[in-house]
Design a protein with these regions (language model features):
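Acidic/glycine-rich phosphate/pyrophosphate-binding loops and surrounding catalytic core
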Residues: 1-76, 80, 92-93, 97, ...
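Short secondary-structure boundary segments
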Residues: 85, 120, 141
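Catalytic-pocket segment enriched in acidic/His residues
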Residues: 87, 121-123, 130
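Intrinsically disordered, low-complexity Ser/Thr- and acidic-rich flexible linkers and loops
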Residues: 102-111
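Short hydrophobic/aromatic patches at helix-to-coil boundaries
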Residues: 154-156
Length: 156
């Protein structure tokens, strides 16, 4: 959620402020978002295709909108799952289930070090997520809530 044409500057400013950028571009990691999942043959098949086409050094992250999507992503071998706009109650219940799944699944694809991330975080609800067991938060607040200086350059 960056300003067109200013992405690299906004990402750099965020980094200078102490933030860790999720990705600088689509080539940093494979991220399956809702449109990819809807367009494709599903999460499991998409992960299978990605594992056979991208370098093994690239991570595969799935943006899950439901608990069943998150579980499917873990079973299929995603390196990370972003729990997209889920309620705090759902997250508190789901995170331990996903952690348990990495220990008990018979799937040979399950990553034992799955990274669980949540979105929908802002300064007003950040403290609600402290004891949920998540690894990362994803927020666009530093970009979308920032005040910009109105400047221009004129030539004569």
């Amino acid at each position: 959620k960056t300003t067109p044409g200013l992405r690299i500057f906004e990402k750099y400013a965020f980094h200078c402020g102490g933030g860790i950028n999720h990705r600088l571009g689509l080539d940093d990691a494979a991220m399956l978002k809702e449109n990819h999942i809807e367009w494709s043959q599903g999460i499991s098949e998409s992960i299978k295709i990605l594992k056979n086409t991208i370098p093994w050094t690239k991570k595969i992250i799935v943006e899950a909108e439901t608990p069943s999507q998150a579980k499917e992503a873990v079973e299929a071998g995603a390196d990370g799952v972003l729990l997209d706009e889920m309620s705090i109650q759902t997250i508190k219940k789901l995170v331990p289930e996903l952690r348990q799944l990495t220990k008990t699944s018979s799937s040979k694809y399950v990553s034992k070090n799955i990274v669980i991330e949540v979105s929908g975080i802002n300064p007003n609800n950040l403290s609600d997520y402290i004891d949920t067991g998540i690894d990362l938060i994803s927020t666009s607040a530093p970009i979308t809530k920032s005040k910009w200086i109105d400047f221009s350059m004129r030539f004569s």
